[in-house]
Regions:
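Short, hydrophobic beta-strand segments
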Residues: 6-13
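Short, surface-exposed ligand-recognition loops at beta-strand->loop->(often short) alpha-helix junctions
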Residues: 13-22
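Conserved strand-to-helix beginnings and helix N-cap segments that scaffold or border functional pockets
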Residues: 21-25, 60-61
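Short amphipathic alpha-helical segments
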Residues: 23-33
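Short acidic amphipathic segments
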Residues: 31-41
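Short, intrinsically disordered low-complexity segments
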Residues: 39-62
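Helix-rich interaction surfaces within compact, conserved domain-sized segments
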Residues: 54-102
């Protein structure tokens, strides 16, 4: 569940459970609306995302928000956060920081 500095492939866990078909539809609609997410493929219980690298900060913020909302493990986002220059992604008091950095 990691991604190398230039690797466009990101593996994440899928949300579990979805509470309705509409819930699932909204998750994938939001995920696919994020500009840096170029492709989404199911892999077992997880998802393989092809992401534009380096990822723009708004797309990364949206990924963090989506994964937080659906309680998806955020650790795979660490390399994406590490390559950001914006101090927002280094601020240890952000609501998502401990979920990404442990």
């Amino acid at each position: 569940m990691t991604v190398e500095a230039t690797n466009p492939v990101l593996f994440i866990d899928g949300p579990n459970p979805f509470y309705s078909q509409t819930d699932e539809d909204h998750f994938f609609a939001w995920l696919e609306s994020i500009p840096a997410v170029k492709k989404v493929t199911g892999r077992g219980r997880g998802l393989e995302l092809i992401v534009e690298r380096p990822i723009d900060k708004e797309s990364l913020r949206d990924l963090i928000a989506l994964m937080t909302r659906y309680d998806v493990n955020r650790r795979p986002l660490k390399p994406l956060c590490d390559e950001q220059e914006d101090e927002y992604f280094r601020d240890g008091v952000r609501y998502w920081h401990s979920a990404v950095y442990g």
